[in-house]
Amino acid sequence: MYKRQVVGSAIAREMSRYRLKIGVLEKNLDVCYETSGRNSGVVHGGFAYDTGSLKARLCVEGNQFMGQLAEELDFKFIRCGKVLVGNTAEDMETLKRTIRQGEENGAAGLELIGKERLHQLVPAVVGEFAMFSANSGIVDPFNYTIALAENAHANGAAYYFDHEVTGIRRDSEGIYILTTPKGEFHTRWVVNSAGLGCGNISDMLGICGYKVIGSKGDYIILDKRTGHLLPMPVYPVPSNTYMGIHVTNTTDGNVIIGPNAEMVTDFTYYGVPQENMDYLAKSASDLWPCIHKKDYIRNYSGILPKWVDEEGVIQDFKIEIRDDIAPRAINLVGIESPGLTAAVPIARYAISLMEEREKLTPNPGFNPVRKGIPRFAEMTKEEQEQMIRQNPDYGQVICRCEKVTRAEILAAIHNPLGVDTMAGVKYRTRSMMGRCQGGYCQMRIAQMIEDELEKRVTEVRYARKDSQMFFGRVREEA
């Protein structure tokens, strides 16, 4: 497998239900550094996609059992609902069409609401009416992706980080040989779930002709003190191809603003220009006038891989096996939004294509349950006292903003996937995600990584292999 991180990990987890030897080749140093960790974190209801499309069908399926999945894998999911806010007669007609389409797609919990009900749901919102989607929700995209990967790993899937696939060929017996800078991998089956790289991998398989462009969206993160003002995501009335700049609450209390949409060919640049931040804030303020620069704590961007036709029209998910060109290769192209919501149904659909061609034997030892790192800050006082008695490391707070303890940092450093970066700790614990953005805890965490993993300080990386943080010590010990 070569993978888009959340979908690829979902495929690895679903494949581990069977007696298969699974290897996941990942070009990055963790599973949530690109599209899967750079999005709004919204669990969509399934009303925004063309009836009959895979996007619609798989999104509705993913929404329906996200709660069960969150219980099994111990990640944060809140079914808080969502509103699409309108003001004009044209907006009203668009929302009515959206509800009809959603009902045809099987999406439940959709209704038009007036101004009074809208302000009961979201008191700070500006608008005359809205479509309320009761079944929409929010998820922690980092923890969700990591949970899928850790459960896949616990059930036998091997993860190979820093293994970018640079070539694919087949030998005389039809075995695929995948070339990486760290060696070759031989396999009967290949899954292309490479996200932004799906077009390149598809070409390597000989399945040519897919045009994949990037849609870059920028975001602003607001301080947690704004969270009580936004109980659910607030969207404008969408266009045919774009959901619009929205404001979204998060599972941990922050608010995020965005995204805009800019078509790009460079899939590596994640900078956020000041003018884009100003545009995001101005646009979102029309919906939710609670945005102040003093509350900005960080910005980020994400890029979605969109498969388009010759006229530039965005296409549906493509999930296929081309027996005539690349037998035993599952090819996924254009897996963009709602990929986060639909990840597990996408995985099951892909595996169903495999089952049509190969008898799969169930894995009797498969365990769907994964336990995450306990969050000290979310425990009751009595629970905290008990944890400290059991492990004194819970009594030492390393990240003051998010109240993350030494015990949690240690658990993240020694994570099952063997990720050893600063960002790996950040995404597993929320350390460095608070108001000071690591001003207090970052050096302490770097020191813990150095000590626990017996690394030199110059070997500590932030997220990517070229993200060296330190180049030596000011004072070397004698």
Model-derived features with residue positions:
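Dinucleotide-binding Rossmann-like beta1-alpha1 core, especially the glycine-rich loop
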Residues: G41-R117, L121, G127, G244-I245
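C-terminal catalytic lobe of FAD-dependent flavoproteins
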Residues: I113, P141, Y242, T251-D252, ...
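Local cysteine-cluster metal-coordination motifs and their immediate loop/turn environment
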Residues: G395-I409, T429-Q447
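Flavin-dependent oxidoreductases
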Residues: A10, I168-G258, E262-G271, K282, ...
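Helical element adjacent to the flavin cofactor pocket in flavoenzyme catalytic cores
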Residues: M131-W189
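Conserved small/polar residues in nucleotide/adenosyl-binding loops
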Residues: M1-Q5
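Short beta-strand to alpha-helix junction loop
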Residues: D50-V60, V85-T94, M131-E150, Y270-E275, ...
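Glycine-rich FAD pyrophosphate-binding loop
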Residues: S16-R38
